[in-house]
Structure formats: structure tokens, C-alpha cells
A protein has these predicted regions:
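N-terminal hydrophobic signal-anchor/signal peptide
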Residues: 1-102
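Residue-level signature of the cytosolic catalytic core of signaling kinases
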Residues: 5, 68, 80, 84, ...
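Short, glycine-rich, amphipathic interfacial segments at transmembrane boundaries or analogous
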Residues: 55-56, 61-64, 125-166, 224-247
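Alpha-helical membrane-protein architecture signal
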Residues: 80, 84, 88, 92, ...
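A hydrophobic, helix-centered structural microdomain
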Residues: 84-149, 184, 258-268
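A short, structured surface patch at a secondary-structure boundary
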Residues: 158-220, 264-268
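C-terminal terminal-structure detector
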Residues: 212-269
Length: 270
């Protein structure tokens, strides 16, 4: 438990980095503290829970649940917060990624890999650290679509990026470059459907610039997602575009069903 004034909350949390859940029992008269603590949690990948007597201090819709005999308030309803839903989604991911990796991917790898090696010096696969579930970094796989360069981990690819190879441009436009991420799915680092993972430098930047950006990391990143089928994909020239992507990702978190995943997959690959 945290013992002290609300003013010292952020300092306390910066020292005690192992905490994941914050329970707030401030009165409604202290609403400004509720809002401050709530925003801190949203932007630092922490679960916020409010004890019922503070419900009037929240400026937004809230959800209630029970921890033992104690009712608590949550900032959103998350279907994947339930163990049975996470198990269902994981079984779905293993089944589809396993079938794809055994039946289709070997032929894709042979053909695409041969063309990559023939047209551009360097490895077939591009490996990059991305931000995943709960803010944990992981190695994300892609077919290499660019010339080997020193800006891969810092500079976002653009439509007319001179680093792209001719074949790489086709890979990116067709999304074939993303297919090795089914390896990440099978390993449990990603899901077939979820928020797209971003490079570490972009996570650091957007976490400061976009409110609630880190919320999207409460679930596994995906090969495709709700944001992508609604036009939020590829290069983000303006901050508002990334803001729209984050809103779409959070909507997906709050409305997940296995049927929604099936719909997103059908739209993405047809």
C-alpha cells in the first residue's frame, strides 16, 4: 500500500517500478487528484482501480468489478482481461499460425527469400526490437524490404523512401513483408489481430506526445488490427494519424470477441 499524500504519487511510483495495479480511495472532493492519478496510470502502463466512494470524481464512464468481497471501479471493460478469453485467443493464434507456418510459409520463404538475396545484398529477414505486451520488448521479424542501413531503428519508412529496394516496395505494398510475424505469433509474442507493434524509439516519442498511447500495450500486438482495416496503416505523416490509430486500438481492446478477430482477418486478407 502507498502511504502518503496524493501530491507525492508520481515520485513514489517512479521508485517502486514493480507495481502494476493502483487502487484509489480518494473522496469525490479530491477529484483533481483522481484525474491526475488516473492519467498517470494510463500513460505509464498501470492498471487503475477506484474504490466506489470516488465514482463521482471520474470525468468519464467507468466499469465495476469485484475483488473478493470488495467492489472496485475500472477505467474500461476489457474482454481479454478474462482468462478464458485469453486462452481462446491463444488457441486461435496457435492453430492458424501453426497451419500457415507448416503449409504455406516454407514456399513463401523459399520464393521471397531467393528474390531478396538475388536483388539486394544482406539477410532475408529483417529483425527489429519492438514494444510488445505490457511494454516488454521483443524481436519482430519481417522480410527485408530495404537496403541494409543505419537508420532502420530510428527512421520511419516513407512512401518514396530511397532505402527501399524495388522488390521491397512490392513486399510492403502487398504486406508480404509482414508474413514472418506469424513466427512471433506462434511463439506467443504477438497475436494475429491486435495493435501493430512500433519500434522502440517511436514508442518513447509517442508515449510523451499522445495521451493514453501506452494503453494499447495491455494486449499483445498483432499482425493486423482494427486500426489497419480502417485506414490507419503505414507511414504516419501527422501526429493526428497516430492518435487515430491509438483510439482504434483501444476500441478493439474494449470490444474484443473472437468473431471480431475473424472479421478483421477476413477484411485484411481478402
Amino acid at each position: 500500500p502507498y502511504l502518503g499524500s496524493p501530491d507525492g504519487f508520481s515520485d513514489f511510483m517512479s521508485v517502486h517500478t514493480g507495481i502494476k495495479h493502483v487502487f484509489c480511495s480518494l473522496s469525490m472532493e479530491e477529484g483533481r487528484y483522481n484525474f491526475s492519478i488516473m492519467n498517470y496510470c494510463e500513460n505509464h502502463l498501470l492498471y487503475f482501480h477506484g474504490v466506489p466512494n470516488v465514482c463521482k470524481g471520474f470525468p468519464r464512464r467507468i466499469w465495476h468489478s469485484m475483488v473478493g468481497n470488495m467492489p472496485i471501479l475500472n477505467l474500461r471493460y476489457e474482454p481479454l482481461g478474462k482468462m478464458e478469453n485469453r486462452i481462446l485467443k491463444r488457441i486461435f493464434d496457435i492453430a492458424l499460425s501453426g497451419i500457415f507456418l507448416v503449409t504455406v510459409f516454407p514456399f513463401v520463404y523459399l520464393i521471397v527469400g531467393s528474390i531478396i538475396k538475388f536483388t539486394s545484398p544482406g539477410p532475408i529477414l529483417f529483425k527489429q526490437m519492438r514494444t510488445g505486451l505490457n511494454g516488454v520488448d521483443f524481436v519482430c521479424y519481417k522480410f527485408r524490404s530495404m537496403k541494409v542501413n543505419d537508420e532502420a531503428d530510428s527512421k520511419q519508412a516513407t512512401a518514396d523512401d530511397p532505402r527501399k529496394t524495388r522488390f521491397g516496395d512490392f513486399l510492403r505494398r502487398s504486406n508480404i513483408d509482414e508474413l514472418p510475424q506469424f513466427i512471433n505469433v506462434f511463439k506467443g509474442e504477438m497475436s494475429i489481430v491486435g495493435p501493430r507493434p512500433h519500434m522502440l524509439s517511436h514508442t518513447e516519442i509517442y508515449a510523451r506526445l499522445i495521451d493514453k498511447y501506452m494503453v494499447r500495450h495491455f494486449i499483445k500486438p498483432g499482425v493486423t488490427g482494427w486500426a489497419q482495416i480502417h485506414g490507419f496503416r503505414g507511414e504516419t505523416k501527422e501526429l493526428s494519424q497516430m492518435g487515430g490509430r491509438v483510439k482504434a486500438d483501444i476500441w478493439y481492446m474494449e470490444h474484443w470477441t473472437i468473431f471480431l478477430d475473424l472479421y478483421i482477418i477476413s477484411v485484411s486478407y481478402t
